Design a protein with these regions (language model features):
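C-terminal lobe and adjacent flexible extensions of AdoMet/dcAdoMet transferase-like proteins
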Residues: 355-502
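Class I S-adenosyl-L-methionine
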Residues: 306-314, 318-387
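Class I SAM-dependent methyltransferase Rossmann-like catalytic core
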Residues: 134-170
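A short SAM/SAH-binding and catalytic strip from SAM-dependent methyltransferases
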Residues: 254-275
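Conserved beta-strand signature within the Rossmann-like core of class I S-adenosyl-L-methionine
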Residues: 289-299
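N-terminal auxiliary segments of SAM/dcSAM-dependent transferases
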Residues: 2-32, 39-134
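S-adenosyl-L-methionine
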Residues: 218-251
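Conserved SAM-binding loop of SAM-dependent methyltransferases across substrates and taxa
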Residues: 186-202
Length: 502
């Protein structure tokens, strides 16, 4: 038996064995004999026996209750980050046929199409193991730009459209706002927003698109206008291209600032640690916006990018802003990426989903380029405007205490953001999650079978719970109603607070 199994076995209460019952019986007789020898009234003897009987009855009740999962907390699913149900049908169609749209704008001949997988593979090396050889304006090269759009832009649209369609409305710009897309490339973010949020199509938005590659922005604007033309009832957003690096001045203050994968590229081009870089990024973001500006930052789900976002999160909170997602609290980040990016095997904040629903043609292209994707991962941060001081101070002291307290009371609710795939602990399904308690280990009552599948037992009595035929997934936000706060333990391996759910 492994050390981990031994550890988790402590939390499984078992009925007393025959040997244990006999041992208890002997102890009880000994107590009786000892009591009879003491020169005390018969009342005291009866009291001792009564206490002993009550203690044993309580222990039996605890074991009985635990076996019925009465210690497990009820919960319900508030939202998911990657549900395909929220992606508009016209967006799904465009994603499926994205290669045809690109071909209609910048056509390749048969020979170039045949060479495309190899060109994609070469570009992949420049973005990863050979990035030190990559030119800053690499997307100005037509071959590399074509490869990038037909592969990376397509995958990024799949990732971003999935995320954007599931974020709350307050994460996005409002009517007539000035918006800034930093490191815009071929306008991937703008296209993803148009696809994922149909309600934004009717808004008159002005977009400043900032990038060092003018060629990629021109290509991206052609792509966006072609896609927007499929909804002729809406006027396309105004696009203002600005050639320059992050920090280049724009003419107006932005009410909405967004970037995708930009910070990761900047980190790759610098030897400075994220702690130093994040300070510079924050100052520049603040310079571009106002106190009312919203931010939406999306990066690859790698430790260093996660660390950068965590540092920015801290600064945004210190400035009085609110985090819309993914954080279910405003406490210190328990998965800040510091130990992970420095080489330790620690959890960092990132979310993933299966690519089985990705366009078939994109999956086939990935296989030809020998870059198959089974999962798509990302880290992100959605930030709203600074909190009004009067509004902030109007909260009662009791409300503030509840928000900031790490102590759980019976009947309180605890929001948890699932931040891992499921794994097995003591033959039960478990997940890592983020909550105001810090790193949290969510244990369900689903048992693992020998074939690796998950079975759910005895849930007919708990119809109010989430449909147990569908497992929780990375990115899900759940609200747990606390029944028994006193029994919460800490995971020996990670220190995570253990929360059992039914």
């Amino acid at each position: 038996m492994s050390e981990e199994q031994k550890f988790y076995q402590k939390f499984t209460q078992k009925k007393a064995s025959k040997k244990e019952k006999q041992s208890f019986s002997k102890k009880e007789k000994s107590i009786k004999q000892h009591s009879s020898q003491i020169c005390q009234s018969g009342t005291k003897t009866k009291t001792t026996q009564s206490k002993q009987h009550t203690f044993q009855e309580n222990q039996n009740n605890k074991n009985k209750n635990y076996s019925k999962n009465d210690y497990a907390n009820d919960y319900h699913l508030q939202n998911s980050l990657f549900s395909t149900k929220n992606i508009p049908s016209d967006a799904k169609k465009i994603l499926e046929d994205f290669d045809q749209i690109v071909q209609s704008i910048r056509p390749l001949n048969s020979r170039q199409i045949q060479q495309l997988p190899d060109n994609i593979k070469m570009l992949s090396h420049q973005l990863t193991d050979k990035r030190s050889e990559r030119r800053l304006g690499y997307l100005n090269d037509n071959i590399q730009l074509s490869s990038y759009v037909r592969y990376y832009t397509w995958w990024n649209l799949v990732r971003l459209t999935r995320l954007f369609s599931n974020l709350p409305e307050e994460s996005f710009p409002q009517e007539n706002q000035i918006c800034l897309d930093c490191g815009t490339g071929p306008l991937t973010v703008i296209i993803a927003l148009w696809l994922a949020r149909p309600e934004l199509r009717k808004h008159k938005l002005t977009w400043y698109c900032l990038d060092v590659s003018a060629n990629s922005m021109i290509f991206g604007e052609d792509l966006y206008l072609t896609i927007a033309a499929k909804n002729p009832e809406f006027e396309p957003w105004k696009i203002i291209r600005v050639k320059g690096a992050f920090g280049t001045q724009i003419k107006q203050k932005a009410g909405f600032i967004i970037c995708a994968n930009m910070l990761n590229e900047l980190n790759q081009n610098s030897d400075m640690p994220p702690e130093y870089q994040a300070k510079k990024y924050f100052q520049q973001f603040e310079a571009y916006g106002t106190a009312q500006t919203k931010f939406l930052l999306v990066e690859p789900g790698v430790p260093k990018a996660s660390r950068t976002l965590s540092l920015l999160r801290t600064r945004f909170l210190e400035e009085g802003r609110s985090i819309v997602a993914p954080c279910p609290h405003a406490q210190e980040c328990p998965m800040n990426g510091f130990k992970a990016y420095t080489g330790s095997s620690h959890k960092w904040c990132n979310f993933a989903f299966s690519t089985e629903d990705a366009p078939i043609k994109l999956q086939k292209l990935s296989e030809k380029a020998k870059l198959p994707k089974e999962r798509a991962t990302l880290s992100f941060l959605s930030v709203t405007e600074k909190i009004n001081i009067e509004k902030k101070n109007s909260k009662s002291l009791e409300d503030k205490d509840d928000e900031n307290s790490k102590e759980l009371k019976r009947g309180q609710t605890l929001k948890c953001r699932i931040a891992s795939d499921y794994f097995i602990v003591d033959k039960k399904q478990a997940f890592y999650a983020c909550s105001k308690l810090g790193l949290t280990l969510i244990r369900t009552q689903a048992k693992s079978q020998s074939n690796g599948k998950i079975s759910y037992q005895n849930y007919t009595e708990k119809e109010e719970c989430l449909d147990k035929n569908n497992s929780l997934t990375s990115g899900d936000l759940i609200e747990v109603k606390i029944k028994t706060p006193a029994i919460h333990q800490n995971d020996e391996k990670t220190g995570a607070v253990i929360v059992d759910i039914c």
